[in-house]
UniProtKB/Swiss-Prot annotation:
<keyword id="KW-0010">Activator</keyword>
<dbReference type="GO" id="GO:0000978">
    <property type="term" value="F:RNA polymerase II cis-regulatory region sequence-specific DNA binding"/>
</dbReference>
<keyword id="KW-0539">Nucleus</keyword>
<dbReference type="InterPro" id="IPR009057">
    <property type="entry name" value="Homeodomain-like_sf"/>
</dbReference>
<feature type="compositionally biased region" description="Low complexity">
    <location>
        <begin position="350"/>
        <end position="363"/>
    </location>
</feature>
<dbReference type="InterPro" id="IPR050255">
    <property type="entry name" value="POU_domain_TF"/>
</dbReference>
<feature type="DNA-binding region" description="Homeobox">
    <location>
        <begin position="259"/>
        <end position="297"/>
    </location>
</feature>
<dbReference type="GO" id="GO:0000981">
    <property type="term" value="F:DNA-binding transcription factor activity, RNA polymerase II-specific"/>
</dbReference>
<feature type="region of interest" description="Disordered">
    <location>
        <begin position="1"/>
        <end position="29"/>
    </location>
</feature>
<dbReference type="InterPro" id="IPR000327">
    <property type="entry name" value="POU_dom"/>
</dbReference>
<feature type="region of interest" description="Disordered">
    <location>
        <begin position="44"/>
        <end position="67"/>
    </location>
</feature>
<dbReference type="InterPro" id="IPR001356">
    <property type="entry name" value="HD"/>
</dbReference>
<feature type="compositionally biased region" description="Basic and acidic residues">
    <location>
        <begin position="16"/>
        <end position="29"/>
    </location>
</feature>
<comment type="function">
    <text>Transcription factor that binds to the octamer motif (5'-ATTTGCAT-3') and regulates cell type-specific differentiation pathways.</text>
</comment>
<dbReference type="InterPro" id="IPR010982">
    <property type="entry name" value="Lambda_DNA-bd_dom_sf"/>
</dbReference>
<dbReference type="InterPro" id="IPR017970">
    <property type="entry name" value="Homeobox_CS"/>
</dbReference>
<dbReference type="Pfam" id="PF00157">
    <property type="entry name" value="Pou"/>
</dbReference>
Amino acid sequence: MNREPDSTVEQQHGSGHLENDAERDTLDFSRQIKTEDFSEALQTGIPHRPCHLSQASMMGGGQMTGEMTSLHPLQQLVLVPSHLQSASQYLLSQSQSGQQGLYQPNHLSLPQQQGGILQPQTGLGLASQAVGRPGLPGSSLESHLEMGHLHAPKHLSVVSDEPSDLEELEKFAKTFKQRRIKLGFTQGDVGLAMGKLYGNDFSQTTISRFEALNLSFKNMCKLKPLLEKWLNDAESAPSDTALTPSANYAQLSEMFGRKRKKRTSIETNIRLTLEKRFQDNPKPSSEEISMIAEQLVMEKEVVRVWFCNRRQKEKRINCPMNLPLKSPVYNSRMVPTSGSLGSMSMTVTSSCSPGNSSRPSSPTCGLQPCSPGSSLISSKPTVNTSGYSNSSSWYRWNHSQYFH
């Protein structure tokens, strides 16, 4: 009784083996067709990058197991058009999982290859190892990465050098300004001189911005050697031509532009002495100016200019206080001035009563009757017009004939 079930089990097991062998044959046949399609697609789509996984997948059918189906989505994924890098990375991840399941029970030498593939690398190093170029010693990606590693320390060194360059530029700008003022040149003179010497015209604004560190770092680095060269030439030129200054004065003026006269600085005690002298005599004569210059050990021209400037300053200080108030302007026909009234004597005889009593009165009383019953006795008032001409407008206006 026990043998019959065993025989049936063996028959079922044998039939199962036959079915498995048939399925393996069909799988091997379909796999070979698909791998051929896969290799053709890779050769047409990616001619310069043949994949090594197609060769690894063409192993004998006896070594394959039922897990071969994991490669179907892999081959379908490769046939879909997409970006090369993303497809190759996904292809590698799928192939690694399939190979781990396929070759672990057979103990082949493929895990060593997998270990080489699974080494951690930065960036795209994984794709560069799995996909190689035949006939080339190394891929361009590896060389690109190597060049990137080479360029990195140079960039860091440039960044670290910038603060020192900025400090040097600041120091040079300060020293340049001090030496330029000491030589007596303006910023405009420096720009003109550099244009004549080196062919690059610079405006006064450019030199001013350089001294104030308002230019860009690149422009300041370009301008620094030119300014340094000009400064050295300007300082060395007077010492070389000290023996013949008159012959080379025109040449120096053309080379270095207009040379500004140095500003005269007067000490505090000398200024106080000059102030005292100005309070005593704001406008000294030429002899007095010479005496003051000798006493203070100064040039006569400097003392004279100081007194001129001091007088102008005094005028600016006192001018608003001493301005006279302007008298109102009136027409000469309307109201006479006070001076004309003082110099004029007027005698008017009029009759303001029936008794014909005469009395001096104001001009208005003589020109018109003071009461309704009064009569005008003298039609022409006696007026002393000394200092006035007969044709003056005031006289004609006040004349009695204008009222008739």
